[in-house]
Regions:
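Serine-dependent carboxylesterase/thioesterase catalytic core
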Residues: 34-37, 73, 80-169
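Flexible, membrane-associating and regulatory peripheral segments of lipid-active enzymes
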Residues: 1-73, 83, 90, 101, ...
């Protein structure tokens, strides 16, 4: 099931847990979203390759350099993007409501399918008038196939072609 993660652990959306997450000085939140068939660990493996430290991830670098609180979204990439987007917008709304501190700004960074899930969540969040949308300052989509992935296009073409063939049933 979809959840937020921090340092590899499930993040409970309770006032106590979120009070530990945010420092008194820092209420800027960055959410990293992985791509297809990955988990939040994807962000660590690339930081390790680039910076040579196996304990390092991009969230930690963002916290150190720009003062953000970073968390990671884990979701089932086998589900449809719209279903994940709708679930993400509700989960983010729960986080904002449960936080004992006012979250002043939100940034979302999505890789590949994660960028599409982020975009879908923004759509549903706006449609449903969630309060977190007003706090959203940036969405970065890294390698997100906004116009369709080549494999998905081929799959759709083949599906339509096969449906047009009259087969005895």
């Amino acid at each position: 099931s979809m959840s937020f993660r921090k340092d590899g652990n499930y993040l409970e959306l309770t006032a106590d847990s979120l009070d530990e997450l945010f420092s008194k000085e820092n209420t800027k939140l960055c959410i990293f979203i992985h791509g297809l068939a990955c988990t939040e660990w994807w962000w660590s493996s690339y930081a390790e390759k680039e910076y040579g430290d196996p304990r390092l991830n991009y969230g930690q670098l963002l916290e150190k350099d720009l003062g953000y609180t970073s968390i990671y979204l884990r979701y089932n990439s086998g589900l449809h993007i719209s279903k994940n987007g709708a679930s993400f917008t509700k989960l983010l709304d729960e986080l904002v409501k449960a936080s004992p501190r006012e979250i002043e700004e939100i940034t979302i960074i999505g890789h590949s399918m994660g960028g599409l899930v982020a975009r879908s969540a923004c759509y549903y969040g706006e449609q449903e008038d969630h309060s977190w949308v007003k706090k959203l300052k940036r969405v970065f989509c890294l390698g997100a196939p906004h116009f369709g992935a080549p494999l998905e296009k081929v799959g759709n073409f083949l599906t339509n072609a096969l449906h047009s063939i009259n087969t005895p049933g």
